[in-house]
Amino acid sequence: NPSSRFDLRLEPTRRFIEQPFSNHNGGHLAFGPDGYLYIGLGDGGSGNDPDHLAQTPAELLGKMLRIDVNVPNEDASGYRIPPDNPFLGGNSARDEIWAFGLRNPWRYTFDDVTRGGTGAMVIGDVGQNRFEEINYEPRGRSGRNYGWRNREGAHDNVTNRPLAYGPPTDPIFDYGRSDGVSVTGGFIYRGTRLGAAHRGRYFFADYSGRVWSL
């Protein structure tokens, strides 16, 4: 936002989330059309989420978080919980959680409402070794469980421990390792130069170099 101003003299507020392994960090932040900050976190790393963190309500890893960072400078926490977060005030799940069951969300986008979009969120979630997936979340549809580690794509994976809650929400699209190796989420096209046939389509890529649209 070109009108934003930052005061570098302010003491930075830091929040740390312990990562048990070095991979699956998520690594993406995005503001939604509601003005809240969405934070996609991976499951903490290693293979097949050995501690089942993406399905553990008391853990932030393997989740999509949603927070309000529009707080006064003197607010020591640095953020607040939006009043309509789905698990706010619950007995077990963390208040910051918006959705469960992500392995390594890389990356996600919101359908731009200023250009005729719906405000929906689309998430590219990197798979373990069989399937890459694209998850679609209509605007405001909170509290979903995208299934990892019990599900990889729309397929059963490691099921010896239960989902935090169900039923899981399957992806709108998944693909196997014969087509790619690691999804990179993209954007819903709302421009005009590519023609009307491409408007509203979701463009995404894979580490192998391929680009698709849905």
Regions found by a protein language model. Give the residues of each.
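Loop/turn elements at helix/coil->beta-strand transitions in domains of secreted/extracellular proteins
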Residues: T13, D34-L37, G117-G119, G200
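Aromatic- and glycine-enriched pocket-lining scaffold segments that form the walls
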Residues: N25-G44, G62-K63
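Asp-box/WD-like beta-propeller blade repeats and closely related beta-sheet repeat scaffolds
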Residues: N1-A30
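Beta-propeller domain segments
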Residues: D43-L214
